[in-house]
Structures are given as C-alpha cells and as structure tokens.
Curated annotation (Swiss-Prot):
Keywords: ATP-binding, Ligase, Nucleotide-binding, Purine biosynthesis. This is Phosphoribosylaminoimidazole-succinocarboxamide synthase. The gene is purC. The lineage of its organism: Bacteria, Bacillati, Bacillota, Clostridia, Eubacteriales. PROSITE patterns: SAICAR_SYNTHETASE_1 (PS01057), SAICAR_SYNTHETASE_2 (PS01058). It catalyses: 5-amino-1-(5-phospho-D-ribosyl)imidazole-4-carboxylate + L-aspartate + ATP = (2S)-2-[5-amino-1-(5-phospho-beta-D-ribosyl)imidazole-4-carboxamido]succinate + ADP + phosphate + 2 H(+). NCBIfam families: purC. Pathway: Purine metabolism; IMP biosynthesis via de novo pathway; 5-amino-1-(5-phospho-D-ribosyl)imidazole-4-carboxamide from 5-amino-1-(5-phospho-D-ribosyl)imidazole-4-carboxylate: step 1/2.
Amino acid sequence: MEKGQMLYEGKAKKVYTTDQEGIYWVEYKDDATAFNGEKKGTIGDKGIVNNRLSALLFEVLEKTGIPTHFIELLNDREMLVRKLEMIPLEVVVRNIAAGSLAKRLGVAEGLNLSRPVVELYYKDDALGDPFVNESHSLAMGWAEQSDLKEIQELGLKINGELQKILDQAGIILVDFKLEFGKAEGKVYLGDEISPDTCRFWDKETQEKLDKDRFRRDLGKVEEAYAEVYRRVKEVLKD
C-alpha cells in the first residue's frame, strides 16, 4: 500500500490518504499540547508509545466485539485505519473525580465515583471543546439519537474492558476520552487510546502516568508514557 498526500495535521497526528479507498495512513507525532493549545512542547518517543499502545488496545477491543478503525500497525509511528465520518463529540468516561469534573463540582481530586460518569463535549478547539448534553447534540444535528445511545454504551463497555487490562498492569483508569465515527452506517471507535487521552494512575502510589505530568510540569513525562506501554504490553504478551 502506498502513502498518499497529507490530508491534515493535528496536534498529535498526521493523516494521509492511501492508494486504497476508505483507508487512511496515520503518523503519530511527539508534539504535545495542553490547555487547548496554550501550552506546547515535545515528549520524547510519545508518538511511538501512543501508536503502539493504541494498536494493542484496539486489537483487544476488537476481540471483545467493539468495532474500531484500526486496521494494521505499520511501524513504530504509523498505522493504517479505516476512513470514518467523525461524530463531532468527545465521549468522556470518568471513574474517579479529576480534572474538569473535580473543579466543576467542587470535589477533591481522587474521589471514587459510585458509578462511571459519561460526559459529552463538542469538538471545537476555538470554543475550548465545551461540555454539552444529548439535547444540544440533537438540536445542533451533531449526532442522531441512536448514535448518541450507541457511543455512550460503547464508552461504558470500553471502560470495563480497559479496566480489566489496566488493573492487571497495576494502573488505575481514572478517566478517558473517546472519539467515534461512522463508515457505511456503522459506528466505530476512532482516534487513539493513550496517555494523551486517558488519565492513568499507579495503583499503589497514585503517581500520575499520563499527560497531566506535562500539563502540571511534574517531570519524567517520557518515563511515565513508556512505563504504561511496558506494563500493558507485559499483560497482553500472551
């Protein structure tokens, strides 16, 4: 398969066409941003970790019946994915209060939620990806009722599957962001699953193993990313 022209470059990835219809070529970058692009930097080998970790987790989710856009891992930084018509919503699943939820509700970071919370955010960098609900999404035509139901149900199912793996790896899944799209009328999980899109805490020490280390200038960012990948790979090696 041949890599074609670059379609667009995002904050963390470059997406290219291929010579096969319906398939994109994705390259993961080391660039890092936070606070809607206000903070910028580089995390060494982030692209490698995010590419390989996403591939591992997409493969596991596929085996449980969750459709993803993942097709094939090409090398350290690149993969082939299915072309999707993206739903312009982020689905955020939270198991523990942290980040914007803790701030918005005035609760301490680290509070265990009695059940997973599912939130929707409208994908728009200029607006800061605002928190929205189903009524907004339907009224604005961002998604159909059936798709809203499906992506939230998939979010909870993905949460359960990821928690099984991460628990064995000694990692707490605090919260995470998902993006979905459609191809031929079917909903697929898109984007990535990585320390860029998830909050991971060490189960014993509660040490942060994700992009919060970059956001908050905690140091050892590269080491945290690599450690997550190492642990997950070890759990899934069989």
